[in-house]
Amino acid sequence: MTDEPIMSRLPIEDVLPALRRILTEGRNALLTAAPGAGKTTRVPLALLDEPWLDGKTLLMLEPRRLAARAAAHRMASTLGESVGGTVGYRMRLDTKVGPKTRIEVVTEGILARLLQQDPALSTYAIVLFDEFHERSLQADTGLALCLESQRLFRPDLRLLVMSATLDCGPVSDLLGQAPVIACDGRLFPVETRYLDQPLSGHLDVAVVQAIRRSLAQDQGSLLVFLPGMAEIRRVERKLLDLNLGSNILIAPLHGDLPQEAQDRAIAPTQPGTRKIVLATSIAETSLTIDGIRVVIDAGLLRVPRFDPRSGLTRLETIRVTQDSAEQRRGRAGRLEPGVCSRLWTSAEHQSLAPRRPPEMFDADLAPLLLELALWGTANPAELSWLTPPPAGAVAQARELLTGLGALNAEGQITAHGRQMAELPLHPRLAHMLLTSVPLQLTSLACELAALLSERDILRGPSGWRNADLRLRLDVLHGEHDYAGGATVDRSACQRVRRTADLWQQQLPKQANKRQADKQEDLQSVGLLLALAYPDRIAQRQQGNDARYLMANGRGALFANPDPLGSEDYLVIADLDGGTQWARIDLAAPVWLRDLETLYADKIQVVDEVLWDDTAQMVRATSQRRLGSLILSEQGLSKPDPSQIATALLQGIRRAGLDRLAWTPELRQWRARVAFLRRIEGQESRWPDRKSTRLNSSHERLSRMPSSA
């Protein structure tokens, strides 16, 4: 079910003696092993009896929950035990370890929690970073903190970085010139097929055609890589419409599925049954799905990318890299000779990037910066990084955390920031939960945070949109199976409730769990969201029901008609960054009076004197602003004369000098001056009547002091 089939000998066995020798010497190490070599589950078991463990535990990081659970189950099964004995795992909302556990498999975010609780990792002898080539933000951060722990507290702590594809030189240098151990060789050969011509037309149609061809000419079950859930659902519907037969099972596999559905997708099938697994990149590494002999790769990947200039994250669909394509190809050769059908040409393959850039370049760094501040590091440059955090993203993250009260002006963590860091949430949501305590809205805040952290509980048909978070809360409070044109995902609702209850338990004891009136709660949704997303408070633009201006100066819109489109003010919790206008995905209305109370200290009064192109006149107003939003304005009774002159000049520049009320006599004078200047040439003593020169003259006049 995980990294390799049960066999008497795997390729990794050949390098285990060298690995044991290096670790016995007390050194860090780097292990590269081809897919299927057996590193994920054989290496931890092979180190169990090493004397340098001295009663301590092995800690292994996996990039995904599914991979962590599967690896733990596989190792426990090899020992003839259940998970929670010698082998256990830890992840958010799910932990199975016991007093006899000696191997802990954890998701990458757990390592930072363990380090914050015990910077020396005193109960662990070694940390293994599996699939490090993925270069996730949490893995990079975990390695930097482990190196700091090793330097300050635990020189005997071993670090082992494991990967299938990795540029070894920089990693070896970071680990103190750590030896590199290479394990070559795949278990079984894989035939690779390319398209003759570049793919044209709809992706889902091409994928279904490739599946039908493979069912007809190849043996075994199929693993199909698709960029996201939307494509998985479309392909699944098309396959179901084909009535492929009772011996063909179709199994989606992605990170938002319940654990039971994920387990079904990777479980063995009955004899005579073939399975078609429709997966995202979740199946790319650390998993062996029993029976898979064919891989069909669409060659695409959907990734979140954070723009520090806008503070927004957008989802982008990108081409896979060569190392990622090789990982996917390897899924077909785990159990027997296999086939990999790539939906691109061999020429296109040569143009693919060798590997993806580290997540550090594309991530929101606010959680990282808060984690480092809790560690005691105000400046990320103080740590040893394989890839240092980009300065622009660090500056944006520091600005956000300072605004939320998590950091002081020197970048050091505050008491409020320490409380935020204790909650396993994005700093925005942690701030919302803590601030909800004095407002007596903790139950609602926990539900909101859970809704925003888990998958959407509503599933609509293609093109369906309803961004209102209040609708989801109403569904969560009731037992509806259908809401607003969408079906209700009951398993997602259960997970949201469980997550909300967990966070309620982690809040300070004075948190009020009153059973508030549900209608009153729904009216407070926008207020709570404004605590988490002050930069995304949005004001509807006049004359347009779909477009909003956010407090950060960015624009946002509803891609399709939405019930929220008539609200004067929204707080946008989730949006796709886009280019000029971001698409609103989740939001709630907020009352202006709540904003004026909540951010009274942030509202500025600005006097503005500007030229109005529409009215062709100077407008002088006093405005109350929240960021880029004009909450109210009124006319100025006594505007500054110099500002009026400047505004008039702006109007003249835009409309041109001909817009002025020239008399016939003045027009004749301009013509005579122009004639004389043309006769005398460049050295003429007569002024240039061109608009640019006259504008300049007017500007000089506007700077002259007015008479008393």
Question: Could you tell me what each predicted segment is?
Answer:
Residues 186, 195, 561-565, 708:
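A short, sequence-level motif marking secondary-structure junctions
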Residues 41, 246-247, 252, 296, ...:
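Second RecA-like catalytic domain
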